[in-house]
């Protein structure tokens, strides 16, 4: 819905203590395919159901895998409940939200770019505790002769302690 919300949720899952996190540079499609195969193996060996797992992936990495043009690359991507391509501008392991209503976010100094993230929906605890939307018509908008939409939300991004093996994070290497 909003880039900040996407970035917050993805960084939240990536920074949960106890989830599998691997950092490595992926220079080509073969390296990306090997990393994705290793992640799938880890998830499946942890007895997570791949059919309930979502793959969040950087479009560049996804393209490198697709460009291999082999059955192996297609098989590595099959079987997930869904595949979501996430722009690199909102795909970090840690972020800082801008304060005082100015909106937006930036990568935390300790944050790394995420290559891909696998999340089992049976592992994730995600819901909005409080959501407020406000629509201001042009008649009462004092800033401009236009509609104004305000959106404020507070949510939870956590994982069940006994199912943290259902989350796998692959970040860019140093």
Where are these regions (language model features)?
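Sequence/fold signature of self-assembling virion shell proteins
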Residues: 67-174
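Extended amphipathic alpha-helical segments with heptad-repeat/coiled-coil character used for oligomerization
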Residues: 42-60, 66
């Amino acid at each position: 819905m909003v880039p900040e919300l996407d970035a917050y949720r993805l960084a939240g899952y990536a920074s949960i203590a106890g989830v599998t996190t691997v950092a490595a540079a992926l220079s080509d499609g073969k390296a990306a395919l090997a990393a994705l195969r290793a992640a799938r193996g880890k998830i499946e060996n942890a007895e997570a159901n791949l059919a309930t797992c979502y793959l969040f992936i950087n479009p560049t990495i996804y393209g490198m895998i697709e460009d291999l043009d082999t059955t192996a690359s297609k098989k590595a991507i099959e079987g997930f409940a869904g595949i979501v391509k996430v722009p690199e501008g909102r795909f970090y392991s840690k972020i800082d939200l801008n304060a005082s209503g100015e909106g937006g976010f930036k990568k935390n100094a300790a944050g790394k770019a995420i290559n891909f993230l696998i999340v089992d929906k049976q592992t994730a605890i995600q819901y909005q505790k409080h959501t407020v939307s406000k629509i201001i018509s042009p008649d009462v908008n004092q800033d401009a002769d236009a509609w104004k939409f305000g959106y404020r939300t507070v949510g939870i991004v956590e994982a069940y302690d006994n199912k943290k093996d259902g989350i796998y994070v692959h970040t860019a290497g140093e």
